[in-house]
Amino acid sequence: MAMLSFEKKYRVRGGTLVGGDLFDFWVGPFYVGFFGVTTLFFSVLGTALIIWGASQGPTWNLWQISIAPPDLKYGLGVAPLMEGGLWQIITVCAIGAFVSWALREVEICRKLGMQYHVPIAFSFAILAYVTLVVIRPILMGAWGHGFPYGIFSHLDWVSNVGYQYLHFHYNPAHMLAITFFFTTTLAMSMHGGLILSAANPKKGEPMKTTDHEDTFFRDAVGYSIGSLGIHRLGLFLALSAAFWSAVCIVISGPFWTRGWPEWWGWWLNLPIWSQWPLK
């Protein structure tokens, strides 16, 4: 891929966290760096292990291939390779690849003199994954509480965990996570729609300005957060969705073992309701 006209001046030495100048180069448009190498290593190794694990299983059906975590009897120990050990190695590879990618983003930010909003945002996605496969299993005492790597098996795990707590939608942190996910979609779709509508006026008319965009929302809802503000809001909403999704699963089991509908008993016990006792 040809280098764009403005790219050359940004391809400068330095900004690396590890390795100095050894891996400080580009392949086409892609910056490599030490963490680019480790990302590639962990990604290739993890993918190869998944394919090898599938070859040892009963099917090549893409929907049914599954790499399961160890049985609960192994606790937090190292399991035999074909009894969950493969899942443990793949998990290490996944974390290694994700963290390496985030650190590679940090190096790119350092080269460009930018702040670290992008790698910080990606780190929240890493947090959600690590919560599922490391933090929660450790708190519950067994790697077997992690989710399997497979399409249908993963969906079965989600369903089973939900039913373990009777009705997972009553989990307050889950409510917050879903609210932030939906609100992110709403905010970003409205923002995207606004930009496209301003950038695509009727034939023969000039492109509209940020004043038009601000005025639209002032007319529509009485307030405009502004061009920079909508991106701050979008980042906050998206990070909140990832954060509360991690919270909702990590409190289920380690800190709350009953059905989530029972958690709302405090609401019924508020003094305000005492004049209407339950019968």
Curated annotation (Swiss-Prot):
Keywords: Bacteriochlorophyll, Cell inner membrane, Cell membrane, Chlorophyll, Chromophore, Electron transport, Herbicide resistance, Iron, Magnesium, Membrane, Metal-binding, Photosynthesis, Reaction center, Transmembrane, Transmembrane helix, Transport. This is Reaction center protein L chain. The keyword Membrane applies. Fe cation binds at H191, H231. It is a multi-pass membrane protein. The chain crosses the membrane at residues 33-56, 85-113, 116-141, 171-200, 226-252. It is found in: Cell inner membrane. The reaction center is a membrane-bound complex that mediates the initial photochemical event in the electron transfer process of photosynthesis. It comes from the Bacteria. (7R,8Z)-bacteriochlorophyll b binds at H154, H174. Belongs to the reaction center PufL/M/PsbA/D family. CDD domains: Photo-RC_L (cd09290). It comes from Rubrivivax gelatinosus (strain NBRC 100245 / IL144). GO terms for molecular function: bacteriochlorophyll binding; electron transporter, transferring electrons within the cyclic electron transport pathway of photosynthesis activity; metal ion binding. InterPro entries: Photo_II_D1/D2_sf, Photo_RC_L, Photo_RC_L/M, Photo_RC_L/M_CS. One of its GO terms (cellular component) is plasma membrane. A ubiquinone binds at F217. GO terms for biological process: photosynthetic electron transport in photosystem II; response to herbicide. Reaction center is composed of four bacteriochlorophylls, two bacteriopheophytins, two ubiquinones, one iron, and three highly hydrophobic polypeptide chains (designated L, M, and H). Pfam families: Photo_RC.
